[in-house]
């Protein structure tokens, strides 16, 4: 830099004279000030214990304060929605169940409701099948919330809570295995009803669980609700008020913890929820603590719903009567071990060529769905789970798109994290309960 920037020049009889003005002193002084705008970019994940290898958070830090947060998704992309376009309508159930793998029965039910709406058979779904759907979804809601409280507590240092939460979830998974044959990814809820009936031994096991779980909830509250460290890590952390939730499209326990009692089971009932008695828990703080209280309260409400559903179960079919849609259901286990009765096998294999042809085409090609498009939404453990299904009149979906609450809710993470401490990012993110299988799908 030239001398004229720091000194004035004038001519005298003795020659050129420079007068130092000290113009650079301000620059020197400001250079010694504390550096207030220096930021560090930190990648939290995907190789991070709390992001489970499937989520990346890019954080700009000023000291320990988060100034900017961005979530990077796509590490668990599976192309499920695209794959649905190459499978028949029934086979779609085996794909959608694998998206949000902690709430598979909600994925299946939303898909089945959309297909049934396209077919125009909503009124033909049997009462027993509808009741079983409610029963299974509410058990699934409890198991999903148990995973949330267990893993969130573990990430904040309460290791014992993780062990207890998964212990009770195991009981529910055993019930699912008894009913569907699988612990996860059931493909149990099908267009037209459910795959098979609920056995009597499963009902007895569910009633035992209804007696056990309220006592376990009291244990959870004793372990966490009055624990000083838990309170410090959750209260006034990850705050998002109702206005912010509505602006970002956030639903589920996060929205209800901000004081808005929005639950699709009440506001837009489906599967006969309007005939059940239950409350919609809310809180007003809009922080991690409020979301914790809402989810524990929702477990209690789901226990009420499960009990009501079990009491409502009456003998009857679990699949629509239309044999152009329904696969053979409620068949006794036969000697072939594949769930076919001897009478059914004898008919399609030895007595009726037409029955064999129909059975073969129904399984391999599937049924046709009239052209049209529908949107169906239900209340999943993480919020509004919506399905936009489009049919061109063929045996396969033209397009199926899921409005996944994990993806939508994750967009609220910057609003919750920015301005807070880096130590609170995990608590705030965990309180959203994102499942990346559903987010990326």
UniProtKB/Swiss-Prot annotation:
<keyword id="KW-0472">Membrane</keyword>
<keyword id="KW-1003">Cell membrane</keyword>
<keyword id="KW-0520">NAD</keyword>
<comment type="similarity">
    <text>Belongs to the complex I 49 kDa subunit family.</text>
</comment>
<dbReference type="GO" id="GO:0050136">
    <property type="term" value="F:NADH:ubiquinone reductase (non-electrogenic) activity"/>
</dbReference>
<dbReference type="GO" id="GO:0051287">
    <property type="term" value="F:NAD binding"/>
</dbReference>
<keyword id="KW-0874">Quinone</keyword>
<dbReference type="Pfam" id="PF00346">
    <property type="entry name" value="Complex1_49kDa"/>
</dbReference>
<dbReference type="GO" id="GO:0048038">
    <property type="term" value="F:quinone binding"/>
</dbReference>
<dbReference type="InterPro" id="IPR014029">
    <property type="entry name" value="NADH_UbQ_OxRdtase_49kDa_CS"/>
</dbReference>
<dbReference type="InterPro" id="IPR001135">
    <property type="entry name" value="NADH_Q_OxRdtase_suD"/>
</dbReference>
<dbReference type="GO" id="GO:0005886">
    <property type="term" value="C:plasma membrane"/>
</dbReference>
<keyword id="KW-0813">Transport</keyword>
<keyword id="KW-1278">Translocase</keyword>
<comment type="function">
    <text>NDH-1 shuttles electrons from NADH, via FMN and iron-sulfur (Fe-S) centers, to quinones in the respiratory chain. The immediate electron acceptor for the enzyme in this species is believed to be a menaquinone. Couples the redox reaction to proton translocation (for every two electrons transferred, four hydrogen ions are translocated across the cytoplasmic membrane), and thus conserves the redox energy in a proton gradient.</text>
</comment>
<protein>
    <recommendedName>
        <fullName>NADH-quinone oxidoreductase subunit D 1</fullName>
        <ecNumber>7.1.1.-</ecNumber>
    </recommendedName>
</protein>
<dbReference type="InterPro" id="IPR029014">
    <property type="entry name" value="NiFe-Hase_large"/>
</dbReference>
<dbReference type="InterPro" id="IPR022885">
    <property type="entry name" value="NDH1_su_D/H"/>
</dbReference>
<comment type="subunit">
    <text>NDH-1 is composed of 14 different subunits. Subunits NuoB, C, D, E, F, and G constitute the peripheral sector of the complex.</text>
</comment>
């Amino acid at each position: 830099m030239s001398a004229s920037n720091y000194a004035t020049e004038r001519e005298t009889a003795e020659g050129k004279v420079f007068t130092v003005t000290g113009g650079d002193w301000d620059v020197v002084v400001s250079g010694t000030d504390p550096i207030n705008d220096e930021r560090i970019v930190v990648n939290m994940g995907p190789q991070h214990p709390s992001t489970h290898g499937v989520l990346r958070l890019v954080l700009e830090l000023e000291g320990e304060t988060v100034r900017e947060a961005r979530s990077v998704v796509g590490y668990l992309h599976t192309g499920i929605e695209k794959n649905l376009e190459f499978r028949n309508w029934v086979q779609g159930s085996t794909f959608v169940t694998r998206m949000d793998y902690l709430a598979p029965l909600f994925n299946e039910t939303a898909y089945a409701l959309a297909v049934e709406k396209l077919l125009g058979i909503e009124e033909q779904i049997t009462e027993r099948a509808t009741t079983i759907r409610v029963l299974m979804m509410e058990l699934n809601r409890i198991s999903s919330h148990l995973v949330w409280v267990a893993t969130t507590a573990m990430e904040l240092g309460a290791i014992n809570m993780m062990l207890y939460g998964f212990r009770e979830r195991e009981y529910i998974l055993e019930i699912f295995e008894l009913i569907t044959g699988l612990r996860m990814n059931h493909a149990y809820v099908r267009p037209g009803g459910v795959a098979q009936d609920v056995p009597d031994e499963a009902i007895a096991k569910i009633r035992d669980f209804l007696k056990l779980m309220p006592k376990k909830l009291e244990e959870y509250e004793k372990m966490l609700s009055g624990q000083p460290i838990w309170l410090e890590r959750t209260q006034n952390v990850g705050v998002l008020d109702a206005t912010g939730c509505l602006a970002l499209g956030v639903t589920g326990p996060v929205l209800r913890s901000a004081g808005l009692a929005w639950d699709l089971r009440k506001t837009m009932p489906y599967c006969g929820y309007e005939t059940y008695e239950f409350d919609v828990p809310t809180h007003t703080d809009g922080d991690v603590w409020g979301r914790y209280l809402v989810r524990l309260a929702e477990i209690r409400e789901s226990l009420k719903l499960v009990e009501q559903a079990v009491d409502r179960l009456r003998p009857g079919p679990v699949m629509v009567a239309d044999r152009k849609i329904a696969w053979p259901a409620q068949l006794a286990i036969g000697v072939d071990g594949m769930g076919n009765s001897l009478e059914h096998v004898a008919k399609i294999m030895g007595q009726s060529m037409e029955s064999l042809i129909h059975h073969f085409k129904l399984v391999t090609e599937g049924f046709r769905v009239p052209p049209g498009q529908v949107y169906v939404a239900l209340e999943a453990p993480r919020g509004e789970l919506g399905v936009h299904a489009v049919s061109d009149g063929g045996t396969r979906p033209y397009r199926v798109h899921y409005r996944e609450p994990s993806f939508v809710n994750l967009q609220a993470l910057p609003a919750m994290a920015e301005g807070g401490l880096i130590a609170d990012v995990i608590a705030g993110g965990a309180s959203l309960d994102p499942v990346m299988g559903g987010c990326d799908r």
